[in-house]
Amino acid sequence: MKSFYGILCVAVLMMFHLEMSESRSNFQMLLEDPDYLSLEKRCLNVGQKCTPGNNKCCHTYICSSLDSKCFYR
């Protein structure tokens, strides 16, 4: 029975290691992407200028057609 728990523990540790190495490579890919931090790719927060009809506001924010700024709906 102890060997079963040992094998199970090793399997869980290997899965955790693989998951961490995959997320690390995805993070590295994001850092190497030159467009990742550009304004075109980033979403806009409340009060930032936006273009109505081209909603690039974050989350549940929308672009106001009155003052062309993101606001919470």
From Swiss-Prot:
Q: Can the keyword Membrane be found in this entry's annotation?
A: no
Keywords, ordered alphabetically: Disulfide bond, Knottin, Nematocyst, Neurotoxin, Secreted, Signal, Toxin
What broad class describes the main subcellular location of this protein? secreted
The source's domain of life comes to Eukaryota
Which N-terminal stretch is annotated as signal sequence?
1-23
- Tissue range of expression? Expressed outside of acontia.
The cysteines covalently paired via disulfide bonds are: 43-58, 50-63, 57-70
Q: Where in the cell is it found?
A: Secreted; Nematocyst
The record comments on the domains as follows: The presence of a 'disulfide through disulfide knot' structurally defines this protein as a knottin.
Q: What does this protein do?
A: Putative neurotoxin.
Q: What is this protein called?
A: Putative neurotoxin NaH-Cpp1a
